[in-house]
């Protein structure tokens, strides 16, 4: 029976991976190509094909302007093809241009002014950014903004924060002179600063204390990203020690825990933070724990023996560790909720989009300065895996993940690599300055180099994703 249940769960996740991946990528590709398409139309460029996917055509229709809208079997991208393109990669067809009549030449992309060609190319990535801003903004408007007090409620022993002199209860006021009013800002700063000294100013019992901390790369396992290394300083905000749910058949469920229970002590030690619970369980070595919970105003003593997980048992964390099978609400102890109007929501959406852009660029820069490894560069397997996991949490999370991917695709396309939009923009910038196009031989050679770079990045992403692929196949067994 357990084997059947596991097979059903794995099959359900596989379907979520496929559905989530197709949902996210199709929308992101459509938005990107629609950006190119709309600006091309505005500039009077004749668009012959708008394709979602590559390869053999599944279905298509032709609109009143003569554009063929097609869907293809390989959903790993898309393209907009202009009248004077030789192929889907927008390589100019010079022979076709020479044979065009005057009407056709008016719609030829390569014959448009350089600023119009640049606008058409830039419109794809910009559409991705705008889409993300609107999606993030819509969620801020819908749910409001939760601000978590930037308090160091829990300090991991031996961490950079502990070494720097952080004390439990320290309230972070600024980092590097930048005011901090939300714990999320601490995380964002730390994640983009591996190996760099950060100057903290904290409030401790009404006194201003200056502390210097250097984030270090720590190996982590989480449900979405799996096993990876992330810069950290070892501080967390307090999370209510309330049981949100229980793992079916887990030690806590067997011991009599119920959703809504508030853990108030473990082995005689007062508990005010879910992080404390996790730490005690993690250090238990599977030994019995005496836990007191508050339920309906009554203190109830419970005894639970943590279960050691087996390698590969948990998709979110393949490392064996003691667990009791309780889920946290994730609700901070110190937080405030702020309602957000539509204009402010768009601003917050733009801020979140900008944070993703700067964080990505910081990560790429840190790879070249040897502060980060390239292990987080992933490909379609990682995107599909994350899409499935977000879909399993809820549709709203999948939509926000789609917005995140939209930012990433937009930014990657702006990298100055020939064959990408950014490479075309570099050629147009040179043309605008010199007054003449870059020689075709140089462009063709650059495109080959660009294609080689893209293929190498894809191979690196595939290599980094082998762990995820192996995990998928292990579930089949």
Residue ranges and their predicted role:
Residues 2-14, 103-115, 228-265, 269-270, ...:
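Functional transmembrane alpha-helices
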Residues 156-170, 187-189, 247-261, 279-280:
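PDZ/PDZ-like domain micro-motif
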Residues 31, 78, 82, 96-154, ...:
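Internal alpha-helical transmembrane segments
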Residues 93-133, 175-225:
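Interdomain regulatory linker/hinge segments that flank or connect interaction modules
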Residues 43-48, 144-162, 167, 472-476:
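Alpha-helical transmembrane signal-anchor/signal-peptide segments
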Residues 13-98, 412-434:
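Small-residue-rich helix-interface/hinge motifs
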Residues 119-130, 401-414:
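Pore domain of cation channels
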Residues 16, 20-24, 29, 400, ...:
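Alpha-helical transmembrane segments of integral membrane proteins
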């Amino acid at each position: 029976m357990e084997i059947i249940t596991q097979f059903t769960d794995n099959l359900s996740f596989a379907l979520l991976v496929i559905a989530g991946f197709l949902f996210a990528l199709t929308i992101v590709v459509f938005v990107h190509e629609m950006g190119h398409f709309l600006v091309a139309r505005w500039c009077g460029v004749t668009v012959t094909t708008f394709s979602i996917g590559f390869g053999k055509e599944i279905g298509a229709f032709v609109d009143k302007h003569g554009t063929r809208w097609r869907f293809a079997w390989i959903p790993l991208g898309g393209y907009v093809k202009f009248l004077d393109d030789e192929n889907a990669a927008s390589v100019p067809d010079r022979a076709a241009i020479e044979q065009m009549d005057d009407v056709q030449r008016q719609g030829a992309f390569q014959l448009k002014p350089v600023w119009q060609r640049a606008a058409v190319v830039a419109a794809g990535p910009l559409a991705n950014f705008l889409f993300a801003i609107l999606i993030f903004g819509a969620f801020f408007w819908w749910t409001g903004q939760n601000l978590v007090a930037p308090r160091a409620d829990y300090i991991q022993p031996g961490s950079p924060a502990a070494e720097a002199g952080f004390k439990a209860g320290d309230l972070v006021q600024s980092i590097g002179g930048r005011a901090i009013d939300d714990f999320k800002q601490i995380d964002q700063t730390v994640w983009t600063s591996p190996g760099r000294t950060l100057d903290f100013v904290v409030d401790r019992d009404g006194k201003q204390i200056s502390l210097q901390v250097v984030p270090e790369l720590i190996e982590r396992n989480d449900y979405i990203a799996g096993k990876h290394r992330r810069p950290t300083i070892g501080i967390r905000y307090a999370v209510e020690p309330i049981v949100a749910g229980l793992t079916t058949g887990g030690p806590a469920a067997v011991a009599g825990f119920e959703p809504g229970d508030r853990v108030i002590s473990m082995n005689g030690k007062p508990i005010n933070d879910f992080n404390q619970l996790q730490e005690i369980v993690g250090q238990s070595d599977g030994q019995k724990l005496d836990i007191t919970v508050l339920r309906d105003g009554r203190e109830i003593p419970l005894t639970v023996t943590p279960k050691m997980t087996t390698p590969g048992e948990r998709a979110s964390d393949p490392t064996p560790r003691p667990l009791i099978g309780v889920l946290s609400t994730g609700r901070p102890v110190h937080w405030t909720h702020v309602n957000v109007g539509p204009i402010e929501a768009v601003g917050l959406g733009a801020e979140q989009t900008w944070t993703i852009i700067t964080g990505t660029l910081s990560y790429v820069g840190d790879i070249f300065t040897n502060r980060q490894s390239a292990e987080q560069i992933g490909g379609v397997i990682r995107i599909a895996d994350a899409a499935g996991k977000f879909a399993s949490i809820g549709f709203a999370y999948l939509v926000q993940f789609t917005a995140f991917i939209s930012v990433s695709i937009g930014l990657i396309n702006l990298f100055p690599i020939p064959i990408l939009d950014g490479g075309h923009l570099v050629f147009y910038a040179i043309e605008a300055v010199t007054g003449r196009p870059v020689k075709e031989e140089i462009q063709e050679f650059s495109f080959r180099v660009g294609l080689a770079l893209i293929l190498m990045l894809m191979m690196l992403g595939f290599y980094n994703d082998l762990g995820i692929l192996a995990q998928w196949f292990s579930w089949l067994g």
